[in-house]
Amino acid sequence: KNGKRILVSQVHGQTFIDLPLSNPFHSIDTQLLSIINDHEIDYSFLEVHAEVTSEKNGIAQNYDGKFTAIYGTHVHIPTSDARVLEKGTCFQTDIGMTGDYNSVIGMKKENAIKRMRTGSNSHRLEPAEGLATISGAVITTKEGDTNSIQSIQIGGVLDRNLLS
């Protein structure tokens, strides 16, 4: 809009993830920051898909001021720490999921709990079918002004629709 350039990107964390993934710091340093600078990106949004909150927070603190917003995903439960960091980057450790929160991370409770109790993956996980909550964050940017971030949960058992 109005000739502005927007970058939306994602990196994966490594802690407790048993996959051959690139180090997210290396990926940001060698790829994303170059794109932001070389292509004169006006607004940049980074999703950090990671298991642990400390890794998401470390990335956000390290790149504060380099991205418009950094937000975490993967653990399905929204954190209550949406804020603007010292150098102006909007951050929330995890924006949560869109799904039924009367569940175990969006799956039917019974089978998920059986898997936990028995340590066996033989119980098939199935999506919960209850009322969904849309979780996320609203990030507001204004050129030359302070950015803001607001956590949202709309509908379902977590409803706190502050946008209406």
Predicted stretch roles:
Residues 1-164:
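Acidic, metal/ion-coordinating pockets
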